[in-house]
């Protein structure tokens, strides 16, 4: 297993644990962007989408409150910068967002 694959596995395991502790049931965790395409640089951040039914009917502020501290814990454990995005399953399945479409087309599902 490559170093990148090990890191993705670690990210998945860490996020699963952090989300469970927050009472969030993730349906899917997707890495997209440069890490998914294999063109990351040393200073690249890791782009991640977390999809959960628990984000349905929640504003961006409510989602931030639910997920507070997850990014900080992930950075502490992995030692890389992250960009975490949180979407409901309805948004993931029905959105025409460029970010969601990019993640669906070129991302890598690491959980779910």
Where are the model-predicted features located?
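Short beta-strand->loop micro-motif that forms the acidic, two-metal-ion catalytic signature
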Residues: 47-50
């Amino acid at each position: 297993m490559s170093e990148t694959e090990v890191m993705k596995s670690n990210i998945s395991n860490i996020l699963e644990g952090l989300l469970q502790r927050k009472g969030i049931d993730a349906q899917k965790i997707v890495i997209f962007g440069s890490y998914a395409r294999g063109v990351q640089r040393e200073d690249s951040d890791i782009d991640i989408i977390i999809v959960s039914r628990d984000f349905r009917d929640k504003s961006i502020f409510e989602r931030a409150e639910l997920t507070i501290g997850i990014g900080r814990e992930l950075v502490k454990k992995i030692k890389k910068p992250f960009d975490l995005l949180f979407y409901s399953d309805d948004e993931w399945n029905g959105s025409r967002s460029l970010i969601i479409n990019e993640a669906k087309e070129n991302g890598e599902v690491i959980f779910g």
